[in-house]
Amino acid sequence: MAGKRTQKINEGVDPTKLYALSLAIGMVKERAVAKFDETIEVSMNLGVDPRHADQMVRGVVNLPNGTGRTVRVAVFARGVKADEAKAAGADIVGAEDLVEIVQGGKIEFDRCIATPDMMPLVGRLGKVLGPRGMMPNPKVGTVTMDVAGAVKASKGGAVEFRVEKAGIVHAGIGKASFDAKALEENIRAFADAVIKAKPAGAKGNYVKRVAISSTMGPGVKIEVGSVTASPTA
């Protein structure tokens, strides 16, 4: 049954064809038929080799229409900054006590923020948070004195991205329940951020391929120009 269901979902998607962004979004939404609200993911193949330091691509983008998911945020801070984080809606706030919790393997959050003075302490968690992509970093705004702003951004649609070994960068940019216009705006915002993060060491064609998919659906390849160009309407 599962095989037949997959075959039916894949019908009408030509894996060798490149589709215009608006058409691709419609195709992906039509095929998101699971019993839950599937995440829509965009994947970009870049002409970089992240093994070289001058070809690393990473950054953060605030999606105009949010991600549609609940993001749990942990903040390492003390005193007034801890109070500000709590007031802004942080789910977990602490210092040494939070370090002990994380070291114990209890990671009940999706994003981690820290004030600069906390980094010597948070640095002990590199082996735990690093592999999960959660280590606070000033380059993506998660090491900051503006903890309230960082918490609100994280919960409001901020998405971190980092190129992987094969030169691929991807992210969930919304839900299948989003209307097509909202998804298109989010995809363009993500693509713009990746393009702006082009490293100095990148040579030749930077954006090689773009595709979108839903959690359970097939990947739909997109004409690169229809993603990187400004919409006409």
From Swiss-Prot:
HAMAP family with a match to the protein in the record: Ribosomal_uL1_B
Oligomer and partners: Part of the 50S ribosomal subunit.
Classification via Pfam families: Ribosomal_L1 (PF00687)
Keyword tRNA-binding tagged: yes
GO terms for MF: rRNA binding; structural constituent of ribosome; tRNA binding
Classification via PANTHER family: 54S RIBOSOMAL PROTEIN L1, MITOCHONDRIAL, LARGE RIBOSOMAL SUBUNIT PROTEIN UL1M
Alphabetical keyword list: Repressor, Ribonucleoprotein, Ribosomal protein, RNA-binding, rRNA-binding, Translation regulation, tRNA-binding
Record-linked Gene3D superfamilies: 3.30.190.20, 3.40.50.790
GO BP, sorted A to Z: regulation of translation; translation
An example Gene Ontology CC term for this record: cytosolic large ribosomal subunit
Protein name stated in the entry: Large ribosomal subunit protein uL1
Family: Belongs to the universal ribosomal protein uL1 family.
Biological role stated in the UniProt entry: Binds directly to 23S rRNA. The L1 stalk is quite mobile in the ribosome, and is involved in E site tRNA release. Protein L1 is also a translational repressor protein, it controls the translation of the L11 operon by binding to its mRNA.
Gene expressing this chain: rplA
